[in-house]
C-alpha cells in the first residue's frame, strides 16, 4: 500500500528532523533526563517509520493483517513518540501515562505482522 510507504518516509524524515532539533535546539535548554526522553521518542519514531516502509512494500498481498499492522504501528508512533515529544516540550508529566498506550500499539502491530506472515507463507 503506497500510503504506508508515504507514512513511513514521512515519519523517518520527521525523526531525522526531531533528532537534529533535539541535538541542536534543545541541548542546554532542557535537562539531560528530558533530552534522553526526546532521543527515545526520535529513535522509536525512526524504527517504526522504517517498519511502515516495509509494510508498505509487502502489503501488496491480500492479507488484511498487514494493513492492520501498519495502522497499529502508525497509531503507536502518534501515541508513543508524540506523547514523549509533547511531554518534553511542556513538561506536563501526566502525558507520560499516554506513552504506554503507544508501546502496546507497537507490540500488537508487530504481532499482527507476524500473524500475517504466517498466513501468507502458509
Swiss-Prot record:
The keyword Metal-binding does not apply. The chain crosses the membrane at residues 3-23, 46-66, 69-89, 98-118. It is found in: Cell membrane. It is a multi-pass membrane protein. Pfam families: DUF423. GO terms for cellular component: plasma membrane. Keywords: Cell membrane, Membrane, Transmembrane, Transmembrane helix. InterPro entries: DUF423. It comes from the Bacteria. Belongs to the UPF0382 family. This is UPF0382 membrane protein SAOUHSC_00567.
Amino acid at each position: 500500500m503506497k500510503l504506508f510507504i508515504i507514512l513511513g518516509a514521512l515519519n523517518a524524515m520527521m525523526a531525522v528532523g526531531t533528532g537534529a532539533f533535539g541535538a541542536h535546539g534543545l541541548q542546554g535548554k532542557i535537562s539531560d533526563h528530558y533530552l534522553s526522553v526526546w532521543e527515545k521518542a526520535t529513535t522509536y519514531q525512526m524504527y517504526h517509520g522504517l517498519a511502515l516502509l516495509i509494510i508498505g512494500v509487502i502489503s501488496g498481498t491480500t492479507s488484511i493483517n498487514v494493513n492492520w499492522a501498519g495502522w497499529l504501528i502508525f497509531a503507536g508512533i502518534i501515541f508513543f513518540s508524540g506523547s514523549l515529544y509533547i511531554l518534553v516540550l511542556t513538561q506536563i508529566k501526566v502525558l507520560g501515562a499516554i506513552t504506554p498506550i503507544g508501546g502496546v500499539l507497537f507490540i500488537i502491530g508487530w504481532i499482527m505482522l507476524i500473524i500475517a506472515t504466517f498466513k501468507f507463507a502458509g
